Amino acid sequence: GTPLSGHEVAQGYKDIKERSAVVRFKVKDEDAYILAWTTTPWTLPSNVALCVNPDETYVKVKTADGYTYYLAEALCDKILGGDKPPAPYEVVERYTGKELGGTGAEPFFDCAVDICAKQHKKGYYVVCDTYVTLTDGTGVVHIAPAFGEDDAKVGRKYDLPFVQLVDGKGNMTAETPYAGVFVKKADPMVLKDLDEKGLLFDAPKFEHSYPTCWR
């Protein structure tokens, strides 16, 4: 499989409001979750890693509802919604993104795990790259090397598994729970499944440029 290139989809971009998602990736061997943000929930079944900015500050926080989360310090108030003092979370520890590198995360979907195993490549851990910004989201992005240039670049840098769970027509493949469903139609289905598993933190509406036709 090859990643879709930027210029291949550059025609026909327009701004549309759609659901983005802040999802909870369970940390391996710890009762805590890494909060990651995505504007393309349909890519989550193809996820193989999480990426942080090595130079930014990240925190482990405990929230009022008893959850422990990792995310960028600068985005805590925005994501955790502490409008009025006292903020509904406490900072337990601070880290640089680099220090979080290597932290293991549990996969959401079994379909990608089998593919990774066949490729004999390590996935499901935190990697670092300066392309991650703190302008939106949580300061943590999920990586699916089959989709998007940045993901592909990070995938090559860390020799991550390549999981392509979308066919040439833009439909989800048979390995996923959404076989034959067009990617954008799969978004709400993915979010619903994650919500039922308790892994969806939030699904705000988000406006961004998106290619409006597939090939």
Indicate where each model-derived feature is located.
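Residue patterns forming the tRNA-binding/recognition surfaces of aminoacyl-tRNA synthetases
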Residues: 1-45, 104, 130-131, 135-215
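Catalytic alpha/beta core of large soluble enzyme barrels
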Residues: 46-48, 52, 56-168
